Structures are given as C-alpha cells and as structure tokens.
Amino acid sequence: MRHKLLILSLALGLFTAPFICAQNKDAAKKNDKNSESDSMITVEQAYLNSIEGVMIKEMVAAEGRDSKRVALQYIEEALNQGRQSEEIQAALSTLATEGLSTVIREDGRVVNNYPEIRRRACELLGQMGTDKAKDSLITVMYTDNEPAVITAAVKSLGEIGKNDNDEVFNMINWIARKFDTVNPTSSLALEILNTFEKMSGSITNKKEMFETVMRIANNYNYVTPVRTRAYEVMRGISNSSSNTDQKKNK
C-alpha cells in the first residue's frame, strides 16, 4: 500500500512538473528570453528525470508483476525519447534478474519468478547499449535457465556489439554448448547463429565459432530451418574470412 501511494504521488509530480516549470519559464522570459529560457529547460529536464528515476525505482521495488511491468513501460518510453540514466540502468539490471538474484518465497514457493519481465528487461538493456548493460546481460546468462530470457540476452548482446577479448563470444559460446546438451531450443540456437554472424568480424577464436555452428547444423533436435541457417552462416563467415585473408596478402 505504501508503494502504491508513493508511486501515485510521484506520478502526480511528474505530470504537474511541466506546468510548474512552464510558469517558471514564462517569468524567466521577462528578464532574458535567451539564456534564462535555456537554463530553465535544463532545470526542468533535470527535475523530470529525477522524478522519473525515483518513480521507476519504487515501482521496481514494489511487490507484484504489475508494478514491474509498468516500470518497464516507463523505461521503454524514456529510452525511445533518448533519455538514459543511472537509475534506468540499475532498474533494468534488477528486473533482468528478478526472481534470481532476489528470491521471495511464500509457503516454500517462489512468488517473484517473472520470466517475461526478465526477458523484456534484457531487450531494453540492448537498447541502452552501454558497457554496464553488456555486463548485466552477461550476468543474466550466467544465472538464468529460461530459454526465452537467454534468447533475448543473446540478441541484445549482438545489438550492442561489444566483444573485447572475445568476452561476449565466450559467454554466448558457453550458452550454446550448455543448451545444446541440456535443453536444445531452436529459437535460442537461431539467435546464437544470427549473433555470431553479426559479431564474426570481432571474434578472435574463429575455430570454436565454426565448431559451435557446425554442431548446431548437425543436431537434429533443432528444426530444419535452424540447421539450414547454420550452414548459411558457416558459408557466409567462411567467405568473409577468405576475402579478409586475400586482402591481407595483397
């Protein structure tokens, strides 16, 4: 109840802030229409971001799936409008491991296991595109076992595109081998192939990448389109590597 009241009050503050700041800007224009107006816009944006960050933090901390879903909606809107902050980063990192890093039990049953929340948080971390987002996604892949969540994390890592010292490749390759043995999942295998294709230029350990792609191609637990895609990726990577070698020899 306390969380709901606080969220409502914060939301009211967020909605009324533009009107308050607009009045302040009108007064400022009378003194200096240029510099003061720019200053007020900066203050207004900082105020809105602060309110937004606090509100998102409270919704993430509140119990229940609905508050976390609303938090994700606020975060998505902020990212679509080009607003990023430490609060948003922290909120997404928390939501991406909801039910894993912090477990709430009632009568011995986990009541905060929300795979769909974690999956969506992973997608938005990809939209963040920061080093911290990359690190959060790698943490998800270490701790989560839900194929849908892991698939979203793999896709987001491919979109971020950071792979210093094969850090991201090694993580994805480990996931590929793990699920290939324990729980072959066609949708995950397909996303791994797509990500390998995107990242192939930055991957140093080409040998292990080829081995993983070929293992997917020869694993009949995967549907035919996925195995066909594996051969396509293999050919594409091989041709790209050959062209690169030819350029180096010229």
Feature-to-residue mapping (PLM):
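Sec/Tat signal peptide C-region and signal peptidase I cleavage site
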Residues: 18-22
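Structural detector for internal amphipathic alpha-helices that build alpha-solenoid repeat scaffolds
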Residues: 34-46, 66-83, 107-111, 115-130, ...
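Amphipathic alpha-helical scaffolding segments comprising HEAT/armadillo-like alpha-solenoid repeats
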Residues: 25-30, 34-62, 81-107, 130-142, ...
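Bacterial N-terminal signal peptides
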Residues: 9-17
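Bacterial N-terminal signal peptides that target proteins for export
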Residues: 1-8
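Short coil/turn segments at helix-helix junctions and helix-capping linkers
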Residues: 144-145, 221-222
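Mature soluble domains of exported/periplasmic/lumenal proteins and thiol-rich metal-chelating peptides
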Residues: 178-184, 196, 250
